């Protein structure tokens, strides 16, 4: 009989994570924490930490006219996207629901697409369905390691290992580099709210890079800290804060939509929803009493149930409990007093602006 651990997939860096506490994450066995979630969280906010995110999907869309084809499919305007630039967007179904949120990295004649681990096969099928047959969809997930190096000291840490100045690669830019003397690809993107890099290398180089960064004093971090960091930055987690029954208008992602585009997958449904009005809206909450809001906890206005929490934690940086959730639009304005049912108690809460945390712009150490 196969145990759960044996059935789960492992990244190529798994042998280097011994000593970590592991957790199932979708179909993967991933490090939850190495030391403590608090220590790992603070390392990223104050210095630098690294995450094994090799479980994420790594698709390459290749062929003549690939950018033009994508421009007709996603709601975001990609027309000005140049090689070396990246764009955050969403893939939608015909009803306007979010199939996945992705980052598209424009290259010469190809677009690299980093997708959520649990949706890799679904996203591959989405691209196969909507892209013309002349565009090849290649899944490089199994052969590549992806490491996120995040924090104010991330650039200073990575620079000595690369063959080019990193200061010239701005946020949401990417480039090929020689890393430890071997070809690699880096992007100035992340999921923590801090300056940082996502580094894509062949599996064998990935182990060497991880050990080199570890020897340089970089704190290894697990999914626990990754979750508290992204939540402070109010970055949504697919499958928890949004899914195929959630539209960008409901999730506060309407800034990704270019309504001037004549067509994209889901446009008609989104336009109808825009005209009719949404029935629920994503909000940020700060809890004013003791208790932590968790996924699925109900949100109240007086005795009326008005919504539900999707993510919540005790913010290490802010020292207070924060949450994301959906409420009826009439209860979504900043300053609105609500309550979250935490087990058998009602904890007062207030709607606050997102993100909960925004990094000081002067913290990056070049």
Swiss-Prot record:
Transmembrane segments: none annotated. It catalyses: N(6)-[(R)-S(8)-aminomethyldihydrolipoyl]-L-lysyl-[protein] + (6S)-5,6,7,8-tetrahydrofolate = N(6)-[(R)-dihydrolipoyl]-L-lysyl-[protein] + (6R)-5,10-methylene-5,6,7,8-tetrahydrofolate + NH4(+). GO terms for cellular component: cytosol; glycine cleavage complex. It is an enzyme of class 2 (transferase). It holds the Pfam family GCV_T_C. NCBIfam families: gcvT, PRK00389.1. The gene is gcvT. GO terms for biological process: glycine decarboxylation via glycine cleavage system. InterPro entries: GCS_T (IPR006223), GCS_T_bac (IPR022903), GCST_C (IPR013977), GCV_T_N (IPR006222), GcvT/YgfZ/DmdA (IPR028896), GcvT/YgfZ_C (IPR029043), TrmE/GcvT_dom1 (IPR027266). Its EC number is 2.1.2.10. Gene3D superfamilies: Aminomethyltransferase beta-barrel domains, Aminomethyltransferase fragment, Probable tRNA modification gtpase trme, domain 1. The keyword Transferase applies. PANTHER family: AMINOMETHYLTRANSFERASE, AMINOMETHYLTRANSFERASE, MITOCHONDRIAL. GO terms for molecular function: aminomethyltransferase activity; transaminase activity. The lineage of its organism: Bacteria, Bacillati, Cyanobacteriota, Cyanophyceae, Acaryochloridales. The glycine cleavage system catalyzes the degradation of glycine. This is Aminomethyltransferase. The glycine cleavage system is composed of four proteins: P, T, L and H. Belongs to the GcvT family. Keywords: Aminotransferase, Transferase.
